[in-house]
Amino acid sequence: MSTDKTNQSWGGRFSEPVDAFVARFTASVTFDQRLYRHDIMGSIAHATMLAKVGVLTDAERDSIIDGLKTIQGEIEAGQFDWRVDLEDVHMNIEARLTDRIGVTGKKLHTGRSRNDQVATDIRLWLRDEIDLILSEITRLQKGLLEQAEREAASIMPGFTHLQTAQPVTFGHHMLAWFEMLSRDYERLVDCRKRTNRMPLGSAALAGTTYPIDREYTAQLLGFDAVGGNSLDNVSDRDFAIEFCSAASIAMMHLSRFSEELVLWTSAQFQFIDLPDRFCTGSSIMPQKKNPDVPELVRGKTGRVFGALMGLLTLMKGQPLAYNKDNQEDKEPLFDAADTLRDSLRAFADMIPAIKPKHAIMREAALRGFSTATDLADYLVRRGLPFRDCHEIVGHAVKYGVDTGKDLAEMSLEELRQFSDQIEQDVFAVLTLEGSVNARDHIGGTAPAQVKAAVVRGQALIASR
């Protein structure tokens, strides 16, 4: 006869129930219930394996699997009663299974611990989340390629130090973000490889005495391999940290992009127009059209950075193997994945709808002596050392500042006062078109190179 006074699956060793506040404090079911689908997936594979090796009968396996599928239906229909006193998603599902099918439900946990169970659940969940995020990155990149192809020759100022530097094209600028997102994609693909290793079968920390077949279970669950050390398998959260690191870099890219969009929509720049559906107004100022989507993405970046630091701090002092600290791994991981996925979705919807204001961008590119480097390069081709050319053009720019003239607005006589090597053909390189067309190499801003880069980008996406 049971003498359990705790009403818990582990209560045999205890003589009094857990304090009510402690039960609530230590429970995780309020947030880990989102793992239910992956918990059930892992349990079905585990039961299938146990029957294969003879620990369960085929009838017991079938009863367990049918019960788990019914429970999944209850959860998805909103008919499942999540109980805090049962601590977590695992025990809630197991208790409901036992209620439905009787003592056979208690056999499911044979050869398994919640330590390897939760580690498996998180990896299964994160694997799916990475796939969703990769899909959103691809969708955003397609939008960037659309803009780059459409605006391959649309001239705008390029900046360093937020000062006018050299003319570029809007399409070239869009491709810069495409490149960053390609690296984000690669990082997440690499992260998925290390995530897709199965800890199940490690039990609490040392393995199990049952004749389990871990490779078979891994095959059922779509894992690439099984984890090689039971101690490491149950305590490893590197994959979650690595994901949050990759997510942080991706959010940093989106935050930088957001900053540019906020600047470009301002009255001081007016480079682009965002459709109304991506903006909001002011409760007091009737004229306002605020770029809330990029502003909010910029703000949400801090949440993902915080998740990374939270997980690093969580793990830094833990001895092997599993510790209750690891219950705190889920909320930051969940939040980082949700935030990145939603931010990418917002950008993927918004970017194709951006409308550049060509005349304003072109006018801005004409200000700030953006073709000064082209004049220096022109003189280099005339045989002068670059440093001498740099100084000559610096004097010409100073003259332009004093007289209010851009280099292209000066007469040949005015330009020749700085170097007698300057001839009439200089004006071909001082135009905006001449400047961008001259940068005709892989990675350059020439419209022909932008179009070629779009083709390469399309091929990259098609290869995924």
Swiss-Prot record:
It comes from the Bacteria. Transmembrane segments: none annotated. Pathway: Amino-acid biosynthesis; L-arginine biosynthesis; L-arginine from L-ornithine and carbamoyl phosphate: step 3/3. GO terms for cellular component: cytosol. It is found in: Cytoplasm. Belongs to the lyase 1 family. Argininosuccinate lyase subfamily. It catalyses: 2-(N(omega)-L-arginino)succinate = fumarate + L-arginine. Its EC number is 4.3.2.1. This is Argininosuccinate lyase 2. It is an enzyme of class 4 (lyase). Pfam families: ASL_C2, Lyase_1. HAMAP family: Arg_succ_lyase. The keyword Mitochondrion does not apply. Coiled coil: none annotated. Keywords: Amino-acid biosynthesis, Arginine biosynthesis, Cytoplasm, Lyase. The keyword Transport does not apply. InterPro entries: Arg_succ_lyase_C (IPR029419), Argininosuccinate_lyase (IPR009049), Fumarase/histidase_N (IPR024083), Fumarate_lyase_CS (IPR020557), Fumarate_lyase_fam (IPR000362), Fumarate_lyase_N (IPR022761), L-Aspartase-like (IPR008948).
